[in-house]
């Protein structure tokens, strides 16, 4: 086995090590997720200082080590300076990095995930300054695509109970559809209510005294009643249904509250399936709460 290898990767996480080093977690096209020491990168004027920063893309020469590999050369080929200049964009980028760190594999090529992450970071960076809720829309779009790549796409076109297509009724302001995280997507509330009524009726019948106990029992398997995690209006479902498209729909600033709802649903869904909280989401909450207060 070669003692050194080349890789192209983007830095997703960095932590201090010793007096002057960093351990950098990098998503590479060729080898997936790797952790490597950036020696001396915390020293003033270190050549690896800026190259070991978050969301920097480098061509790397890495030396194999017993427990941790070591970066010996790094040539920067792409940076995203616009992300650090906007708190909302930075929080959204860190949010995406957390999801990628959960789903990326090690010692396997991850070219599709690498390309997808870079594409969405580029889109976030290119957003015009001041479009705070545009950040939420682009974040939701990116999260949906990352979930789809991992095979965790939420079902947003058909009901998880009836398997029938659900189309939002924009003419009815009271129209609603349920979203069940455990069931994996949207739920027709009429079908859901029907199941609940059936279950209540069955429960009452079981509680009634039976004069004669039959010699046999009939076992009936009822459809499980899903827990409704959220209720969406027609605009919110319409947004959710369009997130599978390669390009995001035109952002309507009158729908800011709807983007908040869509992001919250996708966040809860991602956390459930990834099995861990997205810590950067608290920054998103703080940022958009502050922006909402400033515009009220």
UniProtKB/Swiss-Prot annotation:
GO cellular component entries: bacterial nucleoid
Domain of life: Bacteria
Signal sequence bounds: none
One Pfam family matching this protein: RecO_C
InterPro entries per record: ARFGAP/RecO, DNA_rep/recomb_RecO_N, NA-bd_OB-fold, RecO, RecO_C
Keywords, in A-Z order: DNA damage, DNA recombination, DNA repair
GO BP term (any one): DNA recombination
Role this protein plays: Involved in DNA repair and RecF pathway recombination.
Family from the record: Belongs to the RecO family.
PANTHER family registered for this protein in UniProt: DNA REPAIR PROTEIN RECO
HAMAP family tied to this protein: RecO (MF_00201)
Protein known as: DNA repair protein RecO
